[in-house]
UniProtKB/Swiss-Prot annotation:
Binding partners and assembly: Monomer.
Similarity field: Belongs to the glycosyl hydrolase 2 family.
Protein's UniProt keywords contain Signal: yes
Annotated Gene Ontology cellular component terms: extracellular region
GO molecular function, one term: hydrolase activity, hydrolyzing O-glycosyl compounds
Localisation: Secreted, Extracellular space
Function noted in UniProt: Hydrolyzes chitosan and chitooligosaccharides with retention of anomeric configuration. Has no activity against beta-D-galactoside, beta-D-glucuronide, beta-D-mannoside, chitin, glycol chitosan, cellulose, N,N'-diacetylchitibiose and pNP-GlcNAc.
List of glycosylated residues: 194, 334, 438, 576, 687
Protein's recorded name: Exo-beta-D-glucosaminidase
Active site positions, chain numbering: 462, 537
Catalysed reactions listed for this entry: Hydrolysis of chitosan or chitosan oligosaccharides to remove successive D-glucosamine residues from the non-reducing termini
InterPro entries recorded: Beta-gal/glucu_dom_sf, Beta-mannosidase-like_N2, EBDG/EBM, Galactose-bd-like_sf, Glyco_hydro_2_Ig-like, Glycoside_hydrolase_SF, Ig-like_fold, Ig_GlcNase
Top enzyme category: hydrolase
Lineage: Eukaryota, Fungi, Dikarya, Ascomycota, Pezizomycotina
Length: 890
């Protein structure tokens, strides 16, 4: 094993320099290598030491103008391939995968300014999944040492550094079953390169005699946090890089939110090569508390640490942090329940999908966070896709909690007791694997620790780590100052004694189930994913894109297959060996419940109704039963988004278009809400807030498909913060229905302000589930409800008027318009779909609607708002179940 490593992990900040200008300019600078030349090893010299000397001609190599990219991402960046070509139809299935079956080389030349007393540290943060490193003609690491996609390593290159420098990284082909990588399991087809390459920045850091490790910030505060002081401990490891003793002057400054007091100082003596943890403690008497978005503000403090030797800066770094407290416990039902700042916290979220080629786009992720908050989600789960520091900075800023953790179904869970891998017996870990896993956890813990948005860490997903691995994981986390719950796994298959039960269930579903599934909770031992306990990944598998997106990645033949061949395997689903390679289960429900589609447009509108009712019911079920006798403590929808354009498993499409699954989620997760329990035919009131209490009114009305009133009542209640409770039993009214009817629920406050408006299409029966025949991914329906009368609705006529454009503060370029819908006839206008388009008729994405896919009562008027992140919106396309499609100019 070859390595010239510095034990400390170094973090900091800096800006890349132009060619010929030294990459770093002063102590404390930490600069990513800005771009790469790359080439297959079959096309270059085998003399890698020679290739790592300055002056090599790389004019025939590919050039990627980005600091980080897997092989595929680099080639896309270089213009060799295009997304629209790769994504179209099944083109990816015909790609030349073989070119990545051998090593590839990354190369970059850069300048430095070596001088006495200067040190240069090269740090890897993420290479998938193993590599040989060469610098200025010398090998500094082999692929046994530089192994693991998350195993950040540091290398002291001071003795090799020169004015002109060359660096070569030889990456080896990744095998998910044998390497610690970033796999996709059955989420989507595997990328042709299996994610091989430099997917995170490789940085060069300049220091003086003493280098600084990552800063951690330990915050101790009692509840109630609102009236308690916070003890803040700032920690960073100092390492003497000299062969003589040095005296270190260390200083820390805490700032932000009117934080008072001067610098914290201390002097530290370091023997040659010695490492020592330097700690500073400060008490903030009246701290500003960081809250999840739905509960409050997100004030951030800053901690800056500076190491000086002989009155000259040797190293410096800073990090933001927040004052908050996260705990968890496993209740009497073996379910995990979180608490944030002393308040029970129901996890409401989705499972994140990284880009198939691991390309990071901070602006795109910001839009994703804004979408999640618009859907009233509070948590995002990252299964093995921990991305980059910027992700957590964005979540800190916006108030979205994060559940990072290791992934399932590959080398990360190659335990002797794991009988579910694609290979048997499992390729169990050897000594080097444990070392790789240890360095992976050390690196990720140091990156994650200061961020207040981090809710927890899952050291296992489908299976729990063995005793040897869990000790490494827990020690690495604790040594980093970890303060949030460490969870053994996202399932209840087992657990290590050191951590105890994980308290999360992974019992499905992953494919379509009807809305009443979530409310059918008894007996709970047989009800799998229904709304009780903590569901770490579950959902009805929905997420059908609308036509504007579908045309971007499907051929006409593919589009025809959607509705003409309902059982056909489809490339834009999961992998071809998974249980999710077709829409058979989903389409059975659609055809049986809504009737066979008569066209692609008819299929897509029915699909949006299916998707809308599916996600709405899931979130309403968990929210309603949050304070039940066996509480529904958490719910992660599988999945939030996709790695590529997909036909299922998302709350919004790859092209950022929000459709039925999005608005079903948004309605079902409202902070104050009123919902229909399909199983018991009851009306429930939901309150996710901490402070919104007092009198409320629930208006309940049933009408038939012709608009005739069947029943109407109002219920006055007092809402309870952070709870769900029954407001009314309407089983007698529902039981008398002879056909499909529409149920409208309106929740209002004491001033008459509408807090939630919610419309269902219902019958006197529900879909019948055969729980005894359940599989790991769905529960069979033996009898379906009949919504086919919706195909014979009388035509409604609506008017659509738009208000003047206005700017939204804090969002540059955003345009917002009011859109008023009025249903003039005496029949309901059902499932009205509104799509913002540009002058060419293409979808404007991302886009924000206060509501969409709405159903209007006869003579009802409803005002909505639409906002886009640019000014390209030109008109609104309007369609629905029983209205004529039209386009309204803005």
């Amino acid at each position: 094993m070859i390595a010239k490593a510095v034990a400390a992990l170094l973090l900091g900040s800096g800006l890349a320099s132009a060619a010929g200008t030294p990459l770093t300019s002063k102590a404390g600078d930490k600069v990513p290598i800005p771009d790469w030349d790359l080439k297959s090893s079959s096309e270059v010299s085998k003399d890698l030491k020679g290739l790592s000397k300055p002056g090599v001609d790389t004019s025939a190599w590919y050039h990627a103008g980005t600091s980080k990219c897997t092989l595929m991402a680099c080639l896309l960046n270089a213009g060799i391939y295009k997304d629209e070509d790769l994504w179209y139809s099944d083109n990816l299935n015909h790609f030349n995968w073989g070119q990545f079956s051998i090593p590839w080389l990354y190369r970059h030349e850069f300048a430095l300014a070596p001088a006495k007393g200067k040190h240069f540290i090269l740090q890897t943060n993420g290479i998938t999944s193993k590599a040989d490193l060469f610098f200025n003609g010398q090998q500094i690491a082999d692929s046994e040492y530089q192994a693991g996609a998350y195993a950040g390593r540091t290398y002291d290159i001071t003795s090799l550094a020169a004015k002109d420098n060359a660096f070569v990284v030889q990456v080896h082909p990744t095998d998910y079953l044998y390497d610690f990588a970033l796999g996709y399991v059955d989420w989507n087809p595997y990328p042709p390169d299996n994610g091989t390459g430099i997917w995170r920045d490789i940085t060069v850091k300049e220091t003086g005699s003493v280098s600084m490790g990552p800063i951690s910030v330990v915050v101790d505060i009692d509840v109630p946090v609102e009236s308690s002081p916070a003890k803040v401990t700032i920690r960073a490891e100092a390492q003497n890089l000299e062969n003589v003793a040095v005296v270190l002057d260390a200083e820390a400054v805490v700032s932000g939110n009117s934080c008072s007091g001067g610098p914290l100082k201390q002097t530290v003596k370091l023997a040659p090569g010695e490492k020592k943890l330097v700690e500073f403690t400060k008490t903030i008497a009246k701290p500003k508390i960081w809250w999840p978005k739905q509960w409050g503000d997100q004030p951030l403090y800053n901690a800056k640490v500076t190491f000086s030797v002989n009155k000259a800066v040797s190293d410096t770094a800073q990090t933001n942090f927040g004052v908050r407290k996260v705990t968890s416990f496993v209740n009497q039902y073996n379910d995990t329940q979180y608490s944030v700042n002393g308040h029970p916290f129901q996890v409401v979220g989705g499972g994140y999908g990284a880009d198939m080629f691991l390309r990071w786009d901070g602006d795109r992720f910001t839009r994703i966070v804004e979408y999640m908050l618009d859907m009233h989600q509070n948590t995002i789960r990252l299964e093995g896709k921990m991305e980059h520091p910027e992700l957590y900075e964005i979540c800190d800023k916006y108030g979205l909690m994060v559940m990072p953790g290791w992934e399932c179904c590959d080398k990360w869970e190659a335990w002797a007791y794991n009988d579910e891998l694609a290979i048997f017996p499992p390729p169990v870990w050897d000594d080097n694997d444990y070392q790789t896993a240890n360095y992976s956890m050390i690196h990720e813990a140091s990156m994650l620790q200061p961020h207040p948005s981090v809710l927890t860490f899952l050291v296992g997903s489908d299976f729990w780590p063995n005793d040897e691995a869990v000790v490494l994981y827990v020690n690495a986390l604790k040594n980093a100052g970890w303060q949030t719950p460490i969870i053994a796994s996202a399932s209840k298959r087992g657990f290590p004694a050191l951590l105890g039960p994980g308290g999360m269930k992974m019992d499905g579903p992953y494919d379509w189930v009807p809305p009443n599934y979530w409310y059918d909770t008894e007996p709970s031992e047989d009800r799998l994913g229904a709304a009780f306990g903590f569901g770490s990944e579950l959902g009805a598998g929905v997420g059908t894109p609308e036509l504007g997106s579908l045309k971007r990645f499907l051929s006409q033949s593919d589009l025809n297959d959607l509705w003409k061949n309902p059982n056909k395997n489809l490339y834009h689903m999961s992998t071809n060996v998974s249980s999710f390679y077709n829409r058979k289960i989903y389409n059975q429900g659609l055809f049986k419940r809504y009737g066979a589609p008569t066209s692609l447009d008819d299929y897509l509108l029915k699909a949006q109704m299916m998707d809308y009712e599916a996600t709405r019911a899931q979130y309403e079920g968990f929210s309603s039963l949050w304070t039940a006798s066996r509480p529904a403590t958490g719910n992660i929808y599988w999945m939030l988004n996709n790695a590529w354009p997909s036909l299922h498993w998302n709350q919004f499409g790859y092209y950022m278009h929000p459709a039925g699954s999005y608005f079903g989620t948004k309605v079902g997760s409202r902070i104050e809400h009123v919902a229909y329990n399909y199983q018991k035919k009851e009306v429930w009131v939901i309150n996710h807030s901490l402070d919104q209490t007092g009198p409320r009114k629930v208006d309940i009305e049933l009408i038939d498909t012709n608009g005739k009133q069947i029943a109407k009542q109002s219920v006055n209640i007092n809402t309870k913060a952070n709870s769900g409770f029954k407001a009314a039993d309407i089983s007698s009214q529902i039981g008398k229905l002879s056909s499909v009817a529409f149920l409208r629920l309106i929740l209002s406050d004491s001033k008459g302000n509408v807090l939630s408006r919610n419309v269902y299409w219902v019958t006197n029966s529900i879909d019948k589930l055969d729980w005894d025949s359940s599989t790991w991914y769905y529960t069979q329906v033996t009898s379906f409800v009949d919504y086919t009368p919706l195909n014979k609705l009388s035509a409604a006529q609506i008017s659509v008027t738009t208000g003047s454009s206005r700017r939204v503060a804090g969002v540059p370029g955003t345009q917002t318009r009011t859109v008023t819908l009025e249903n003039k006839p005496s029949v309901p206008a059902v499932f009205i779909r509104l799509t913002l388009v540009d002058k060419s008729g293409n979808d404007v994405n991302p886009v924000s609607w206060t509501d969409n896919y709405v159903t209007l009562w006869p003579k009802e008027k409803l005002q909505l708002e639409v906002g886009g992140w640019d000014a390209s919106g030109d008109s609104i396309q309007v369609s629905g179940r029983n209205i004529a499609a039209t386009t309204v100019k803005l």
